[in-house]
């Protein structure tokens, strides 16, 4: 089944959905996704991991510098280490630690600004949306000790962690948190000039 899932930057991407649902709009697709915090122990198949990594290749970055680096964490011993740096590991069967190389990111010519957070977050968005297409759950975690996660995962100094993504099959009965349904009114975040 072909499902249109994204209109990021006014470009529509068409994906072949693994589910039986058809979403006629990106809005409906986005409304159906929620942060999953309870996971089945079932491992994620390599072909699905590869599909998640392929959408990172498509993520736009400033000047196409492509500073992203994804650390795929599947070994049990490494997953246990994550519990020492965050209380939000959620016992997922795998994690993506999304980082950006501070030596490769775009730097503003006159201001002290780097594209680390934006470039990394666009990759995060691509991953969590593709995970939903593949029937996987995910949640974006930034509540971790930055230097400690670099130490336990053994990533180089030039890599800046942007987000930790617990990923896996949602446990039966997984449902959105109450906060998921709290949305600001459009008039509260838009101002026409």
Which residues does each PLM region occupy?
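Glycine/small-residue-rich phosphate/adenosyl-binding loop
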Residues: 48-122, 151
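Structured binding elements
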Residues: 135
């Amino acid at each position: 089944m072909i499902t249109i899932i994204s209109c990021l930057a006014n470009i529509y991407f068409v994906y072949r959905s693994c589910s039986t649902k058809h979403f006629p709009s990106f809005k409906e697709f986005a409304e159906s996704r929620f942060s999953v915090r309870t996971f089945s122990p079932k491992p994620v198949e390599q072909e699905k991991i590869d599909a998640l990594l392929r959408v990172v290749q498509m993520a736009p970055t400033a000047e196409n510098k492509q500073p992203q680096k994804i650390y795929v964490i599947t070994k049990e011993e490494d997953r246990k280490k994550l519990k020492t740096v965050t209380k939000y590991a959620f016992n997922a069967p795998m994690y993506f630690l999304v980082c950006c190389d501070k030596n490769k990111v775009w730097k503003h010519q006159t201001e002290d600004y780097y594209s680390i957070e934006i470039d990394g977050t666009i990759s995060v968005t691509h991953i969590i949306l593709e995970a939903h297409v593949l029937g996987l759950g995910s949640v974006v975690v930034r509540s971790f000790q930055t230097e400690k996660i670099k130490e336990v995962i053994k990533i180089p100094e030039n890599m800046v962690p942007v987000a930790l993504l617990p990923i896996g099959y949602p446990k039966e009965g997984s449902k959105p948190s109450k906060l998921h349904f709290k949305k600001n009114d459009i008039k509260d975040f838009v101002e026409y000039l």
